[in-house]
């Protein structure tokens, strides 16, 4: 904790500098700079407040010890002892909170995301489940005051999706939804099942951070561009011109289709932006996979082949296999109430990081 305390002192000094800069007329008149400083100040605020509270508690404890040692009034001594009992109970809690706030931040946590959901094993039932997951994430996004926009979709005749890609924008989207990467398994009785048997199907979810300006050069020769007509559910044509765009990055096989914009040019620009994000993420993930392989206490790669969660409809139960969490409220989870699961995953990840820091200390 001593190392952390030394870091915190310089952090507080930097925080106070930022506050002074925010009051500087020159900074106030420079909107971009002001926003950057304001964001940094907001990011540091919680840890600075916790540290100040920690220092206040420590000082009050020492002051009370003075009273206990030197005071003759028994009532004052008893009051100081009671106060110290409460303050000392808060100290380890504050230390844990500070340690978590001081953990290295994922540089992508503030980013918006591109989410792709695919029906996997299970045919029509898998495509229906992909649609259910889409609605679950849309409802969760609504609860978080995030915005969801459709990028591309392949609807099925039964009302599900073979594949659907969406963009979710808002505050710290990636920090919460990055844990959704992987295979999601559903156990339920399909509508078409006459014998009442429970079937098992899967859908995969891929979550990628959306990079505003990706520093990656893609050779135009490595991209194949196809244009086609935009279509709605069931294959109905939205327009009669070839405005939809499909881009394939040949070296990686990454495909991006875009039909949500009004013109082919807009679809091309958006598709290229997303393609760059995905190619960048692909190479970043390779580096991350090599790093994770060396980590003794890896939380999990988030690989799509992993079965991360099971949704059991007959028993109204959802289980996250990575952390052994089971909730008997599947109906509420499918209605977008994901906070309990996501908060538990964040806490698990933070605990693992703290263990690693302790091992390396």
UniProtKB/Swiss-Prot annotation:
GO terms for cellular component: cytoplasm. PROSITE patterns: RF_PROK_I. The keyword Plastid does not apply. It holds the Pfam family PCRF. GO terms for molecular function: translation release factor activity, codon specific. Keywords: Cytoplasm, Methylation, Protein biosynthesis. Signal peptide: none annotated. Methylated by PrmC. Methylation increases the termination efficiency of RF1. It is found in: Cytoplasm. It comes from the Bacteria. The modification N5-methylglutamine is found at residue 236. Peptide chain release factor 1 directs the termination of translation in response to the peptide chain termination codons UAG and UAA. Belongs to the prokaryotic/mitochondrial release factor family. This is Peptide chain release factor 1. It comes from Lactobacillus acidophilus (strain ATCC 700396 / NCK56 / N2 / NCFM).
């Amino acid at each position: 904790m001593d190392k952390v305390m030394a870091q915190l002192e310089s952090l507080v000094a930097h925080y106070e500098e930022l506050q002074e800069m925010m009051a500087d007329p020159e900074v106030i008149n420079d909107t971009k700079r002001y926003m950057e400083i304001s964001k940094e100040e907001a990011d540091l605020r919680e840890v600075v407040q916790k540290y100040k509270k920690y220092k206040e508690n420590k000082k009050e404890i020492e002051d009370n010890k003075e009273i206990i040692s030197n005071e003759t009034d028994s009532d004052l001594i008893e009051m100081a002892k009671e106060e110290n009992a409460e303050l000392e109970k808060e100290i380890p809690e504050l230390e844990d909170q500070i340690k978590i706030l001081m953990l290295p931040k994922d540089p992508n946590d503030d980013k918006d995301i591109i989410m792709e959901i695919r029906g996997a094993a299970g045919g029509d039932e898998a495509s229906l489940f992909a649609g259910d997951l889409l609605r679950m994430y849309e409802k969760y996004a609504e609860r978080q005051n995030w915005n969801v926009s459709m990028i591309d979709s392949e609807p099925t005749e039964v009302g599900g999706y073979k594949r659907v890609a969406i963009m979710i924008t808002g505050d710290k989207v990636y920090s919460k939804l990055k844990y959704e990467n992987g295979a999601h398994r559903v156990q339920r009785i399909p509508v078409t099942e006459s014998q009442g048997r429970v079937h098992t199907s899967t859908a995969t979810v891929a979550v990628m951070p959306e990079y505003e300006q990706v520093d990656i050069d893609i050779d135009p020769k490595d991209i194949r561009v196809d244009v086609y007509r935009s279509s709605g559910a069931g294959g109905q044509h939205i327009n009669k011109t070839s405005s939809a765009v499909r881009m394939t990055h040949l070296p990686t096989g990454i495909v991006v289709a875009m039909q949500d914009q009004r013109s082919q040019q807009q679809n091309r620009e958006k598709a290229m932006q997303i393609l760059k994000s995905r190619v960048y993420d692909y190479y970043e993930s390779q580096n991350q996979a090599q790093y994770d392989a060396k980590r003794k206490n890896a939380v999990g790669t988030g690989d799509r082949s992993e079965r991360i969660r099971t949704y059991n409809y007959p028993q109204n139960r959802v289980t996250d296999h990575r952390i052994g969490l089971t909730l008997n409220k599947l109906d509420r989870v499918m209605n977008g109430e994901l906070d309990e699961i996501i908060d538990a995953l964040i806490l698990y990840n933070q605990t693992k990081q703290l263990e690693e820091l302790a091992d390396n200390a």
